[in-house]
Amino acid sequence: MSQSTPLTVFVLSDSVGQTALQLAQAALAQYPNVKPDIIRFPFVHSVDKLTDVLSKAVPEETIVVHTLATTGLSEIAQNYCDAKKIASFDMMSPLTKLITAKTSLAPSGEAGALHHLNDRYFDRISAMEFAVMYDDGKDPHGFLEADIVLLGVSRTSKTPLSLFLANRNIKVANLPIVPQAHIPDEIWHVDPKKIIGLMNTPEVLNNIRRERMIAYGLNPDTTYSDMDEIKAELDFAQDLYDKIGCQVINVANRSIEETAAIILEQTGLDFASSSTDHVN
């Protein structure tokens, strides 16, 4: 069996980055002996963020591909890569130059302009992708980009709430809270007004967790559903929320819709999202 060749590919975009990701994956599929490590960097809107991302690229090991529509960013990316001898490919500029040559019209230079085919619909898709990408603390950088950050111990409805709010075009990241676990540094750089600490009563949480274990065909009497452990988790979470200074919502016996409505009201996003309610 031939040995696989490793290759790191940075995918940069000032929008979600799905287009660049799919094109990169299609090209890499032509090389079965290449073992790619594809790292996506979405929502690269500023020069500072762009250079910060590019500074992580190792010239001998990395290819940078990008779809940067924001005016000036693609040129800055190309100049940086040329100077550092980093292999790069601009997926956007060659085609926009051809279109300009044929039409004598300049591109808008606006990130995610494709979304304007139906702003509200595509904004919703973007928010959904954001919620999935930054669910369960997968990438701490998402906390800095989110409209709302949800914190909570296991089974406090973090993921369902994230997806429900994403359906209102709101970018949500969430983080599971586990006693003594490291809290990402990014959390302390988020405006506390954007952070919601989710709580529950020990009794309700105990019932939910026991039912969850039974549904999986497992023994419901474990540390996960132990009342003392649950109380310790909730105490740890409350102490963390107090340190952060964030708003706290008890989700006990509340529907996802009811909790989401409280979150929107407390964060002031209820009016901003209301115009999207009737999109088909």
UniProtKB/Swiss-Prot annotation:
- On the tree of life, the source organism's domain of life is Bacteria
The broad enzyme category this protein falls into is transferase
Return one GO MF term.
ADP binding
Q: What is its EC number?
A: 2.7.11.32, 2.7.4.27
Cite the InterPro entries for this sequence.
Kinase-pyrophosphorylase, PPDK_reg
Keywords recorded for this protein, A-Z: Kinase, Nucleotide-binding, Serine/threonine-protein kinase, Transferase
Which Pfam family is an annotated match for this chain, by its short name? Answer: Kinase-PPPase
The answer on whether this UniProt entry bears the keyword Transferase reads yes
Record's catalysed reaction(s): N(tele)-phospho-L-histidyl/L-threonyl-[pyruvate, phosphate dikinase] + ADP = N(tele)-phospho-L-histidyl/O-phospho-L-threonyl-[pyruvate, phosphate dikinase] + AMP + H(+); N(tele)-phospho-L-histidyl/O-phospho-L-threonyl-[pyruvate, phosphate dikinase] + phosphate + H(+) = N(tele)-phospho-L-histidyl/L-threonyl-[pyruvate, phosphate dikinase] + diphosphate
Q: What HAMAP family does the record tag this protein with?
A: PDRP
Give a short account of what the protein does: Bifunctional serine/threonine kinase and phosphorylase involved in the regulation of the pyruvate, phosphate dikinase (PPDK) by catalyzing its phosphorylation/dephosphorylation.
- Protein family per UniProt: Belongs to the pyruvate, phosphate/water dikinase regulatory protein family. PDRP subfamily.
Please report the name of this protein according to its UniProt entry.
Answer: Putative pyruvate, phosphate dikinase regulatory protein 1
Q: Which organism is it from?
A: Latilactobacillus sakei subsp. sakei (strain 23K) (Lactobacillus sakei subsp. sakei)
What taxonomic classification does the UniProt entry list for its organism?
Answer: Bacteria, Bacillati, Bacillota, Bacilli, Lactobacillales
